[in-house]
From Swiss-Prot:
It comes from the Eukaryota. This is Serine/threonine-protein phosphatase 2A regulatory subunit rsa-1. The lineage of its organism: Eukaryota, Metazoa, Ecdysozoa, Nematoda, Chromadorea. SUPFAM superfamilies: EF-hand. Its main location: cytoplasm. Keywords: Cell cycle, Cytoplasm, Cytoskeleton. It comes from Caenorhabditis elegans.
Amino acid sequence: MPTDEPSKRKSILPTIPTSLMLKKSNEALSDFERTFNDRVMDIFAENRRIDVEEFKKNAECFLNIIRSNKIDLNWGEGGESRYVTITRLMKILKTSPQSIKDLLPHNTVSNFVKITNYNLTIDITLLEELVRTVIHAEESYIKLLPFSENSTEISSYSLQDFVATHFIPIMIEEPENPVYYTAYAVGTIFFLLGARRRDCVYLKDLLASTLLLQLEECIHAENHCLSPPKIDVFTVAQFRTTLSEFRFLDSQRKGLLAPADLKFFRDGIFNEVFTKRIFEISITYEDGRIDFKAFVDFVTALKFRHTTASAKYHFEILDLKDDGLLDEEEIRSISSFQLQNLPDYVPEDNSVNPEVATAELRDMMRLNQNGITLEEFLANRMNSTFAGFLSNSDDYMKYERREQ
């Protein structure tokens, strides 16, 4: 068992040595080994609860000292924001418990100063949010332990069980199909964590992403009839919209979509080359169809198009040769199809010669003779505009009219 005392702990998410634990999904585990795993988890979780309670007391005391100091507390020009000077913060940290010192290493303090950008001070709201998210991560970690594989990972199925156990019951208005909701929420989480094709994600990545906190805030907003949070993807309303789109496209009512079904997705704005590739990069089932999870991947990629996960997804679709390079031939092929199949409502004077479009897109992505790699695509700030131009007529028109 680990002996990570709060005073010595550097990481907020310690893990049990892997030599002690085997993955739950290992079918070779005996009943004794499974019982042993559960017991280790229980003891570990109880120790973590004690640590969290102590950290919460220390954090509240720290914030109270920050808030109560009138000499070094600045209120900003508008009188709305509260700031603490670096000098004062350093003095307070000197006498703070080790857990608080670990919370604010030098690089974190430096980043907060840059974000605040006001006379070498830190906006106290940043400190409050940091404490809130760390406490939420710690408490979520304890709740996740019984569902995790070995204290470090959790599978998609176990995370669905976790959502069903801890989130569905607190919804005032439950989704009509909780199983689909958990699949939707977990599918979104796995996609945004870049784990679309993986069975498990690391708990540290899950908690660092704050996606579970966003899920909780969505439920809180709907329960209390508040405005949806900025990231509203986990609201029941958004889930219903996605499920309704899926059911509308499911022509055979089998819970699966064929390539022809996606022709009607969002009024048919996505070109056929693009939508067919979705089936080539996803797990398919009967007659090459995709299920709700693959559809959620697609919808999430569109909703969060400025994320790394979405950029990777679009690169994979546009890489027609599946060789890890996006070259001029592929761009020409997709752009030619896109330009030749624009909707009828697009004026003819907005049409562009495919060669001109290819040259413009090539310059946009700084394409070399061999093409560009995924890493180069991710590093290019225009990748979202590029992907939109090649995938759907709406983004194509926005780009063409950008100077009007």
